Amino acid sequence: MSKPFKLNSAFKPSGDQPDAIRRLEEGLEDGLAHQTLLGVTGSGKTFTIANVIADLQRPTMVLAPNKTLAAQLYGEMKEFFPENAVEYFVSYYDYYQPEAYVPSSDTFIEKDASVNEHIEQMRLSATKALLERRDVVVVASVSAIYGLGDPDLYLKMMLHLTVGMLIDQRAILRRLAELQYTRNDQAFQRGTFRVRGEVIDIFPAESDDIALRVELFDEEVERLSLFDPLTGQVESTVPRYTIYPKTHYVTPRERILQAMEEIKDELADRRKVLLANNKLLEEQRLSQRTQFDLEMMNELGYCSGIENYSRFLSGRGPGEPPPTLFDYLPADGLLVVDESHVTIPQIGGMYRGDRARKETLVEYGFRLPSAMDNRPLKFEEFEALAPQTIYVSATPGNYELEKSGDEVVDQVVRPTGLLDPIIEVRPVATQVDDLLSEIRQRAAINERVLVTTLTKRMAEDLTEYLEEHGERVRYLHSDIDTVERMEIIRDLRLGEFDVLVGINLLREGLDMPEVSLVAILDADKEGFLRSERSLIQTIGRAARNVNGKAILYGDKITPSMAKAIGETERRREKQQKYNEEHGITPQGLNKKVVDILALGQNIAKTKAKGKGKGRSTAKAGIVELDMTPKALQQKIHELEGQMMQHAQNLEFEEAAQIRDQLHQLRELFIAAS
């Protein structure tokens, strides 16, 4: 099933890229464990890494610091490798509240979560690709260091079907139930199956557009065919097919029974400790909760919060690292840590926060001590598991530089000839009015502006002020979910609005060639948001435009500002020299705007169900303003049918959306008649 990596690009490496590719490949072939690619904004770091992957033909994991950047990298890698398996692995929670206990107020907070089904499907697809083929690039967030099902148990649970195989229908249905698939003869959706006579239709959990039909003749598999679950159209017949579990956390029955005995033993030991310390309430609470979980596991094979017993289910000893996505990556895999100056500290911080919360739960009898082994990797465990690693950043941190030693590969020259932005420092007193006049100049020539503030309050007030003065502005904040965040960035590039205001979200890696001005308010306030690295990264957002400019508002030049300005000037001079030597005229990037995640219908659904925090409007079914009365009438009739269908299916939000659109269409129809 694997194919060789085949790089699809209209460009050949140029500038500093060929030398960077050669040095990275030589380092990997010589067995170097750590290398750093120091590449400035817009120098084509992703293209360099794609060339290294294609030349070395090794399965690769790319770690990104957040979902937004992971989505952008996923889109770019998919364009570079359209014929290979490019996968996306990030946290599938749209909302997550872990269970916690607050002793001071005696408050227990139950676990509450909302799972994004589409991202869950993409996670399953990623692990399937890693198990089945070698031409894989998995773009992951820090979610990759969190516990995942044991790959050995996961492989044991797979159901292999081949044409001519002898197996009765009830055995297939029983195996599907073990894989946590549910029978649903009415609504056929991901992770379900339906039975019609001797035909079983299965919708694989890792697929979003293809299902499997198993046709039996008595106790023999007569035919296996792949079909479109929406239309029922048969795409092809296959000689064999492997059905993967619906979740990464499935466990064989015998392992569950064994784990239950181990849980009972630990419960007995823990009860003795609590009683010896006169903690009667905690002992009673722990016994009741654990016995309930054991009963559920015995009857159903799983329970709510089963991840807290993961140590027993995967057969690990106390303190051993949990199985993670790294266990699915082949031994000769390659790890690329993008924006490493942010990603590496993130990995280091995950374990401690999780540990503090779990210790309280254990101490007060909500969980057994083994629950503390359901955790992300410690930093030293990550280091031990990580294969050969390339750190990628425009501003590498001390850790990467220390690990790489002399193996820092510079990529400062941009093939496009683009220079780093011109930097100006202006006084704080008039920053808002000055910014408004700058925005108007840029909007007049169809260019975009990014504004970064220090606080959420300042960002909200500034957005309101700019709106009052007639500017098309949006505010990007932490409450906006992943998909909508990508939509906002896409809308900025398309010119739906001119100004994007943010706090810490407009930094690493965001690729927006239309942005010609970056304004940094209160740049002279020293702190992590105005450190040398933060300033260089933020200034870099304007480095993809020919007219790139950065304005730092401050009454004094801090050491961080001086270093950031000095480094930007150094890079600008080096690029200028390269351009003069090679006769290059700087050219803007004409990068096409695409739906990075290509989530299809899910984007529309997410926007419809969104909380309206992003000031976005859902655009269901685009309507041309110059439609003829006849075409409008036809469209109205079509949408009325859709609205009634949604109402019958109890999908009232979608029906209401179409109702609002019908109201606008009828007004257009009256005006046109």
Swiss-Prot record:
Using the UniProt record, give the first listed, main subcellular location.
Answer: cytoplasm
Could you tell me the keywords of this UniProt record? ATP-binding, Cytoplasm, DNA damage, DNA excision, DNA repair, Excision nuclease, Helicase, Hydrolase, Nucleotide-binding, SOS response
User: Which amino acid positions bind ATP, per UniProt?
Assistant: 39-46
Q: Where is this motif: Beta-hairpin?
A: 92-115
Give all residue intervals belonging to the Helicase ATP-binding domain. Answer: 26-183
Q: Respond yes or no to whether keyword rRNA processing is given for this record.
A: no
User: What region holds the UVR domain?
Assistant: 633-668
Q: Which GO terms describe its cellular component?
A: cytoplasm; excinuclease repair complex
The record's GO molecular-function terms, alphabetically, read: ATP binding; ATP hydrolysis activity; DNA binding; excinuclease ABC activity; helicase activity
Localisation:
Cytoplasm
Q: Where is the Helicase C-terminal domain?
A: 431-597
CDD domains, per database record: DEXHc_UvrB, SF2_C_UvrB
Q: Which InterPro entries match?
A: Helicase/UvrB_N, Helicase_ATP-bd, Helicase_C-like, P-loop_NTPase, UVR_dom, UVR_dom_sf, UvrB, UvrB_inter
Question: What's the stated role of this polypeptide?
Answer: The UvrABC repair system catalyzes the recognition and processing of DNA lesions. A damage recognition complex composed of 2 UvrA and 2 UvrB subunits scans DNA for abnormalities. Upon binding of the UvrA(2)B(2) complex to a putative damaged site, the DNA wraps around one UvrB monomer. DNA wrap is dependent on ATP binding by UvrB and probably causes local melting of the DNA helix, facilitating insertion of UvrB beta-hairpin between the DNA strands. Then UvrB probes one DNA strand for the presence of a lesion.
The free-text domain note is:
The beta-hairpin motif is involved in DNA binding.
What the entry lists under PANTHER family is as follows: UVRABC SYSTEM PROTEIN B (PTHR24029:SF0)
Question: What assembly does the database describe for this protein?
Answer: Forms a heterotetramer with UvrA during the search for lesions. Interacts with UvrC in an incision complex.
Give the record's family classification. Belongs to the UvrB family.
**Could you tell me what this protein is called?**
UvrABC system protein B
High-level lineage: Bacteria, Pseudomonadati, Pseudomonadota, Gammaproteobacteria, Enterobacterales
